[in-house]
């Protein structure tokens, strides 16, 4: 899907390389032996000159600027929507294919919103030279639901998320740790990054959207429909942040146009791409957990069961590392599709 240089000669730029997702992007490129002749680490001026480990050596962070993308084939962006809006078109004009992890381009009709396990062919049409990486909570949900949607067509999804603090960045995880220490010692915790105490607490920290929903919840509604190619799918999300460092969890109720049993859902999920299925009778602690998912690639699916109140509907529990499949891994998988190495 890339024109010009062969894949073995691909030059990759990582924008926002010093952030939590940017660092994970570098680790993912290395771990998956992505075929790059050169990797460029880009960030703001205050991060320029930093050294980042890569393939047994170090990359020196360069300051992001208008000329940063000369000779770059693929630019992985994870520096926020403002940076992506400004520099995404610059990178694309310089000849790079942009894979953007921010919310800047996701709902643009000329920008594909891709999850490789769900809609890999969407990236073939990219008139702006930009491909959007979906929101972390959306990615893991659609990976788990796509096999079910193909079999019985989803009518309505009700999802409650339990999202890790790393989704808010390095500073959020640091504040969580300091708050836990303070609370354990009987002191009042410092509250700067979050709008409220996060230690020993659950709450939301996203901006308000429309109709009483947060922006995060609206992302899940709109992105799910776009990725799955079906605007008729109903999505009812409630998103909260929990005092976990890494790993988002989701309780999901799904209704279908054609009734689907839990037994059939398990058959469909076994061996589905990107999924690790946790089966067996319910037992305390036997479900997928963020602590076990952290630092791993799969989307873990468990607690698959028939809904006792709604015949033909099922409930399931979905967990994934939000920095990996929820961000960096998905972006690198898109890059692999571009160079034909997936």
Language-model segments: which ranges?
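Charged docking surfaces used in two-component/phosphorelay signaling
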Residues: 10, 75, 165-342
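N-terminal Rossmann-like NAD(P) cofactor-binding subdomain of oxidoreductases
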Residues: 2-198, 232-234, 267, 299-300, ...
């Amino acid at each position: 899907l890339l024109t010009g240089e062969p894949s073995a000669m691909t030059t990759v730029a990582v924008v926002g390389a010093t952030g939590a997702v940017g660092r994970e992007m570098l680790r993912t490129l290395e771990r998956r032996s992505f075929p790059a002749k050169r990797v460029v680490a880009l960030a703001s001026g205050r991060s320029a000159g930093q050294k980042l480990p890569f393939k047994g050596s170090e990359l020196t962070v360069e300051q992001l600027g208008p000329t940063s993308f000369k000779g770059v084939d693929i630019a992985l962006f994870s520096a926020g929507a403002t940076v992506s809006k400004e520099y995404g078109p610059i990178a694309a004009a310089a000849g790079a294919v942009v894979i953007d992890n921010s919310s800047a381009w996701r709902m643009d009709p000329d920008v594909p919103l891709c999850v490789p396990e769900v809609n890999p062919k969407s990236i073939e049409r990219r008139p702006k030279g930009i491909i959007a990486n979906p929101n972390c909570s959306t990615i893991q949900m659609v990976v788990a639901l796509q096999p079910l949607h193909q079999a019985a067509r989803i009518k309505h999804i009700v999802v409650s998320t339990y999202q890790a603090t790393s989704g808010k960045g390095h500073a959020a995880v640091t504040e969580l740790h300091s708050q836990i220490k303070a609370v354990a010692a009987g002191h009042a915790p410092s509250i700067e990054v979050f709008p409220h105490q996060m230690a020993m607490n659950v709450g939301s920290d996203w901006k308000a959207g429309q109709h009483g929903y947060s922006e995060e919840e609206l992302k899940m509604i709109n992105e799910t429909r776009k990725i799955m190619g079906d605007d008729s799918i109903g999505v009812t999300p409630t998103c909260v942040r929990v005092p976990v460092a890494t790993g988002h969890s989701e309780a999901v109720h799904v209704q279908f146009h054609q009734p689907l049993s839990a037994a059939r859902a398990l058959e469909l999920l076994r061996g589905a791409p990107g999924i690790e299925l946790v089966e067996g009778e319910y037992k305390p602690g036997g479900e997928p957990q963020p602590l076990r998912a952290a630092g791993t690639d799969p989307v873990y699916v468990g607690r698959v069961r028939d809904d006792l109140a709604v015949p033909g509907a099922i409930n399931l529990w979905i967990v994934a590392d939000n920095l990996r499949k929820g961000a960096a891994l998905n972006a690198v998988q898109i890059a692999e599709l571009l160079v034909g190495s997936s």
